[in-house]
Amino acid sequence: MSVSLILHAFLFIIAGNYKEFWQRLLSNKWLFILLAFWCLHALSLTWSTDLNEGWDGLRVRISLVFLPLLYIGTLSLKQQQIITYTKILMLAIVVVIGLNVIHYGVLIQNNLALDIRQLSWFGSHIRFGILVAFSGVLAFNLWKKQVISTLILTAYLILILMYTVYSQTFSAILSASFVMLIIGYDLIRSTRFSRRIGIGFILVVGITGAIAIKLIATPNPACGTFESDDEARKAWALRSDFPLDSLDRKGQGLTRTAERYLCANEVALTATSIQKLSKKDVLNIENGFTSRHSANGGIWSRLEELKFELHEAKDPNGHSLLQRFAYWKTAWAVINDHPWLGVGIGDINREMENKYNETGSTLKPENRNRSHNMYLTTWMGVGVMGVLLLLWGICYFGWIGFKEQHLVLLAFSVIVFFTMCLEDSLETQAGASFIGFFIAILCGQHARTAWTTKNY
């Protein structure tokens, strides 16, 4: 938590209006769901053996409760404040996007860009990507209030969509898709041509989705091996200081990287093909890229990687999707052993590591992580009751957003619900603070009125 928040809390403790705070708490009874969720994690310390790990987990998760309690209990959010804060956030996002792109461009020019996550210069690649996608519905809210023009909204949506696609972050792409669907739903609902537009919109989304699924489900053409390993090594030695039987800069086998790169170029796997490679091609292979698409980045690069992971890769190490499958399988095995109370918030890492060893996981030690699924992590830590509380809270916020036509809250709830399937959203300070902050400014009774009041 920031110094300003700690100071705010300290001043409230000294001179706060406790009666008003209690009344606000009672008028926002959903806060008790957050309190129960955190208290259940605190209680799980009694059956945890690693108390240091447990206390650290509680410290991170306290932002989820502390921010809503402090904001809703002591502040009254006005519509003009919402407009001002949203403008500042949008401006900050545009500036950071610009700096990220410039920085990444410099890395590319100097052949230092090895991973798309280097695009995010200032923090978590995934978290910033989700924030960028979510900001689309914030901009749409300003447009509905006639604060920004259609031109500005369109330009902003195009910018964040282009950045999201280029970032190759699946959670961000998923979030942006939901934001676009919710914006489309609201536009359709408010027009007299809703049926025709709705049918057309559904057809476009359906056809686009079908094409994407078809592309991913279709395996790449089989890629063999070099016709002569000796000749390939000799030809490669004339082009690069990296031995062909060594590793590329990503830690992958250089021979296989070169073979896949040549296959992507649709040329024969021969020494002659190696000799015809450009200097840029050789550098791409040294950097671990398996095609010109993957070296250039973008959504096509991510689709190629997904196809390879699903249809060809055998070793999960270094492949994000296959590693997640391994995480989920291991986490589920831990849950099967402790379904009701979990292992305690402090013992999740230990039990995951024990299960990796017990099942003979092929993941390398540095790739053996937690589940990357907040529902599984919660179930492992505090049992089935924790998962039910988590789902109850998210679904309640989504229902309120839908019932009150609070599109920002609806989008936030849908994004949180689905991204928690892919990320341990509450396991980092940034993630817990992100969710806690937006719960605080979106879900309170006074805040909901300010967000949904029309000024046109």
Predicted regions mapped to residue ranges:
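Aromatic-anchored transmembrane helix interface
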Residues: 30-37, 51-75, 88, 93, ...
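Long extracytoplasmic/lumenal interhelical loops at the membrane interface
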Residues: 308-337, 341-382
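Transmembrane alpha-helices of multi-pass inner-membrane enzymes
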Residues: 6-12, 180-183, 194-199, 390-393, ...
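Hydrophobic transmembrane alpha-helices and their immediate junctions
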Residues: 381-414
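Hydrophobic cores of alpha-helical transmembrane segments in multi-pass inner/ER membrane proteins
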Residues: 5-11, 64-73, 127-141, 436-442
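Transmembrane signal-anchor hairpin modules in multi-pass inner-membrane enzymes, especially those
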Residues: 1-43, 77-87, 142-151, 193-200, ...
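Membrane-interface micro-motifs in multi-pass membrane enzymes
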Residues: 1-3, 56-60, 119-133, 168-171, ...
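Alpha-helical transmembrane segments of multi-pass inner-membrane proteins
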Residues: 9, 42, 83-113, 122-252, ...
